[in-house]
Amino acid sequence: MKARVLELLAENSGADKRDLARLLGLKGSDRIQLKRVLKELAAEGVIEGRKRTGFTRKGELPEVAVIRVTGLDADGEMLAAPLAWDSNEEPPTIYVTPPKTGGAPGPGDRLLARLEPVGGRSSPRPRDSGDAYEAVIIRKLEAASPSRLVGVVRESPQGARLVPIDKKARGEYAIDKADLGGAKNNELVAAEPVHGRIAGFAKVRVVERIGSMDSPRTISLIAIHDHGIPVEFPEAALDQAKAAQPIDAKGRTDLRSVPLLTIDPPDARDHDDAIWAGPDPDHDGGHIVLVAIADVAHYVTSGSALDKEAIKRGNSTYFPDRVVPMLPEELSADLCSLKEGVDRPCLAVRMVFDAHGHKKSHQFLRGVMRSAARLTYAQAQSAFGGNPPAGMSALVKTTLAGIWEAYRSLTIARGKRDPLDLDLPERRVVLGADGHVASIAFRERLESMKLIEEFMVLANVAAAEALEKARTPLIYRVHDTPSKEKLFAFADFLRTLNIAFAKGQVVQPGVFNRILKASKGMPHEAVMSDVVLRSQAQAIYDPANIGHFGLNLAKYAHFTSPIRRYADLIVHRALIRAFGLGDGGLTDKEIAALPATAEHITMTERRAMAAERDSTDRYVAAFMQDRVGDSFDARVTGVTRFGLFVRLAESGAEGLIPIRSLGADFFRHDEKRQALVGERSHTVFRLGDVLAVKLVEAAPITGGLRFAIMDGRGGEGAAMPAHRPGRPHRTPKRSKAAKPARNKADKRKFKPKKS
């Protein structure tokens, strides 16, 4: 009977005992057996029973449920989550079908909806297959009211308006003159909703004046306020930082005679790592590598005001014009920073490698160091190439030679490890003396950067291995293997390029590297790294270790940047505790809180990434304002139901070609091919295509760029702005051309990952 009950629940989710008895044809005492079967299935965790919605298969939603809209995914699909979810597992993804009439719901809105699993209720859908539901709205139960809005004040003959900075915002808001709080036209403000409407616009009241949009420094402030990044330090934390004193070398290993070097970008705002390497006298061809890291734990003790603010921030956040530090500048830019020629406390690891780059041993120590030189990547690279900068001392030249020799052997082991090797050009915003954007360029990728990365990775591995061997709890940096859903989508795309990729294989980073190598010289080479990146999971912090897929490492933790990452500070405290390195070790209270801490700092890291990305987008949009109407070569980097994302060849600036600007044809979104296909013209726009485009709109407030195709394949004149100034706060109707059939279980989020 168990199998039959499960079949019926698959076809009739939410059926209660009476429904099941009727479907099974059971009467009288025969129902007792059904009751026993239901109890057994519930005890086995196979089904769930709810008072109002009856029985469902474990992890399944009923046919009708109340859901809350949570936002949009990278493809513009509206997402929702069930209000009632009793399972310990993550709820399945719900895609909301926009209503045919009336305004679309927004984030926070509660909906009564009919839910249908993608593929049907009777299809087998294991929990790890990326379950998804499609929701058809029955009625809207409650409209959401944002508690805080950030936007720009615009004066008009009809009165003041608030233009939200969020690209996804559904229109403008009205501001009564009495609610302006002194804010002027073109001023960035924070506002809160108030009761009432003016000429169809919802009303808001200004609660904070942030800055004038005429000032270039306001661009970063938009992202800071939009993402809720803490800026001001509490007085107690500032007082502790100001009271901090230089360390006493007593009780520490003296490393001041070792010519440790810092190698950083020219605009580095903190220096938390220094390196030295030389030949190992005990192993022919081997090397000793010393990585010294700022001893932040000496100054930031558990439970202190500094510590509470540091964990709240989670990490430093970097913008083109400023940094929002995790620690006050008295520490981050001074006492903790490994300045040239100044005594500084450090936590160091001494690693011994053989001639092939395999680690023989490691040892952690708490010391005092004195940096022999502060170098930039370019200076180190010149020295490695035999052309050291003028004035470089013989000691520094000799030290760099030893570092380079060690790196050459370490690359042998790295090559065998075969970590994921992506070529992802990074935009760099160059500001002029006046704070405005002087240029947008790509960051140069030097071998000296790879050297520092390799030294840091090895130090991080040593920290994880040492703590695990000492049985001391820690927070790992983990990166899961790609999900089946993403691998299947990746395989489907590769098949359209005649590249073989077995869906059922056990993947390793080397599999992706071979595909990247095979793509060299092919038309799709420029986007293959992006496609591989999108197939990956996001790295997170977790006290439970699952390894790091991208780096192809079994054990990995963040140890090398405690000035700017709280995760590293936790690892430092764990090392101090594990090896009896003095005061400031990890406490029992901190150990108990590690799961919550890991979850929190994962959130703050993603918050910082989003803020940094949004700020860069706004700087780029401001820079491109003067080039509206110009034409460019662009490559398609993303294909969605609502248009094409493109990247300009000359600057890396990214924007959207709306599907409505592609002409009168009906374009179907082919997810497997990553293409938009014209039903009548058979015109195809594919990922990786190079197009001639014209910049139609640049919006510094939101950071959006809008393009139109110039090569005759699209209808430039059909381009429409996402929002017309002066429209009330509501959702525009979606173009019919953006509603083709799609497989919603095959969604992919296009977001950057970090190691």
Model-derived features: where do they sit?
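A short macromolecule-binding patch
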Residues: N88-T97, A169-A174, G652-D670, G717-P721
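A generic structural motif
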Residues: D73, L141, P157, I210, ...
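Short, surface-exposed secondary-structure boundary micro-motifs
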Residues: E116-P117, V194, T637, V696-A698
